[in-house]
Amino acid sequence: MDKYIGKRLDGRYEIHELIGQGGMAYVYRAYDRIENRWVAIKILREELSDNSDFLRRFRNESKAIAVLSHPNIVKVYDVSFGDRIQYIVMEYVDGITLKQYIEQQGEIKWREALYFTVQILQALQHAHERGIIHRDIKPQNIMLLEDGSIKVMDFGIARFTQAETQTMTDKAIGSVHYIAPEQARGGHINDKADIYSVGVMLYEMLSGQLPFVADNAVSVAIMQMQAEPTPPTRINPSIPKGLEEITMHAMEKNPAQRFPSAADMLEDIERFRRNPEMVFNYGDQVDHAYARGTSIYDTAGSRQQDYNDNYEYEEEYVRSRNGAKASMVGAGNVAAVD
């Protein structure tokens, strides 16, 4: 029997059930007797309590999320780094991972894929503006709630852009199918590495396939650095050309050729949403908005308002979910634990 189930941590958190586990931590559903709410508690494995690298990663997660406050990022409520037990108390998210949803659905309709992508990018924009790079964006780290809202989680290997030191373990870390080429080679990274990972997820949602697959992680990493992905329209011809361009632009090998920021990618998604027939021709379009140093919107605030006013993707999502809602009921999940 699990030694934590039935126990109360710090006289406050009643642990009810194990809902996830990985190489670094266990995640439990617990009830907060003070705030009268369900929470998720991530507890570091005892055998890792003396491992400085895992301790740093574990504590870094709470440190990173503590400076973030966004509806699309899992909240941290409390932390405890004692001698006997180390844990993080987080928002309890009852849903499934985006990876599970992709596996259930196969190819995802492009409007729905964009509905998810916009929320992910808004979360990353919030993090990047505060100097935090996630570095492990993948559908396993994205929670999907039944109403279609997205929660980005697992900032365990996030890095502050102003950090003075970066170990070799830091440089090469991430999930090989989604990491940027510069991550794969252990080079310097910035927020454009997260943009690349979003591009890979969008590719996977639209085509139902990962851009690079091989027998081992090293081979996939080499492909990330050297191979060109099959254009997603060759796999799914129903993908609009402009959306394919957005996807491939996010996945450029050279970080300097990607979207400069999450905000810029959001901007072009909005342009495409308003006119799904448009194409971007990123390779030779010299008057693109970010090349001019201007925006198609007067202010960032008005841009954000456009995203929030009447997002048509939500209607598409609700319609598509009507036939699949049962697959999410009872499939509660919370955070990836590594």
Regions found by a protein language model. Give the residues of each.
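Juxtacatalytic C-terminal regulatory tail of Ser/Thr protein kinases
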Residues: 260-335
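Conserved short submotifs of the Hanks-type protein kinase catalytic core
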Residues: 83-97, 101, 105
